[in-house]
């Protein structure tokens, strides 16, 4: 409910990152993304997510589509991360492609 309220109040697409990231936009049904894990709590990974949203926007998606795609890709990358390898914002950013 908070994501939808924020999106409606500001007239924007909102991403509330956490365990079960929510993407909401005016006139859209909010999307709950279940990919991702605690590794994304690392400093800077939210900045990587913001850059990934921007990359999807630059590729021609609308804001809601870009946010949904980026959130899923970001989370799936963490889920697929090799065991025993540290996930840092820098290594995450270098591995992502749009």
Spans of features found by a protein language model:
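Short, small-residue alpha-helix embedded
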Residues: 42-73
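Charged C-terminal helix
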Residues: 75-98
């Amino acid at each position: 409910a908070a994501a939808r309220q924020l999106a409606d109040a500001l007239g924007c697409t909102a991403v509330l990152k956490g365990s079960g990231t929510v993407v909401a936009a005016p006139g859209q049904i909010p999307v709950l993304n279940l990919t991702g894990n605690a590794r994304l709590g690392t400093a800077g990974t939210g900045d990587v997510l913001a850059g990934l949203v921007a990359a999807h926007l630059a590729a021609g998606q609308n804001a809601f589509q870009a946010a949904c795609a980026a959130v899923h890709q970001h989370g799936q990358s963490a889920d697929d991360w090799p065991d025993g390898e540290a996930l840092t914002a820098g290594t995450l950013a270098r591995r992502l492609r749009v």
